[in-house]
Amino acid sequence: TGVSLTTVAGTFTTGAGSAITNAASTDFYVSGGSGAVTYAGTIVNTAGRSVWVLNRTSGSVTFSGAITDTSPGQGIRLENNTGATLAFSGGLTLSTASNPAFTATGGGTVTVTGASNTATTTTGTAVTISNTTIGAAGLTFRSLSSNGAVNGILLNNTGATAGLTVTGTGSAGSGGTIQNSTGIGVSLTSARDVSLAYLNLTGNADDGLNAASVTNLTLNQMTLTNNGNGPTAEGIDPDNVRGAPTPTNVTVTAPAH
């Protein structure tokens, strides 16, 4: 492990010149503790997990340097951080194949900012945020892609503050492609302020996009093709979407229903 902090109450800070490359097991590991943790250096990972933060009940953990995680890397995992704040602002380049790329579950507040963040997988979910609040700065990715995951994107109970934005770069498909999911391609439940642009949803076994109890949903320049394999599956399936859903130049072709 490059850095391992377990039940640390004091402050831990490193400067921008720091670097961790392919540490055994986990590059940056934080378990418990309440002190502020700030890492401004880079992380390059091609084997274990790049970042793993768990069981924090308070305090902040901030990563302001670039993080690159490539297969067979195991991505970023944040779990059971009730009361803690976790922030990523230095740029994420995650390409983790069958492993989930970015996962936050079980509490706390998380933000991902910057214009160049990407997450690409095969059968791993690109982004999962479940029972965890997306903070005011939001969760921003330039592109999200998966091929054969259960879900490509999963948001569930992400709080009442902010949401996920996929920006693309202005050209078709530049926001990524969620394809061949065994379930719903993009699953949104009890989420808000979700904005998806230039994202393709193709060949997902259930709905291409399912939005249940979502407030403020914006879809822009999206193409949804051949989603669903049953009589109730849809290209887009909204259920109790609050605020005016805003679709702009969205094309839905050959849904199952």
Stretch-by-stretch model annotation:
Residues T1, G10-T26, S34-G48, R56-G73, ...:
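Beta-strand-rich solenoid/repeat architectures in extracellular/passenger domains
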Residues S4:
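Extracellular glycan-recognition regions
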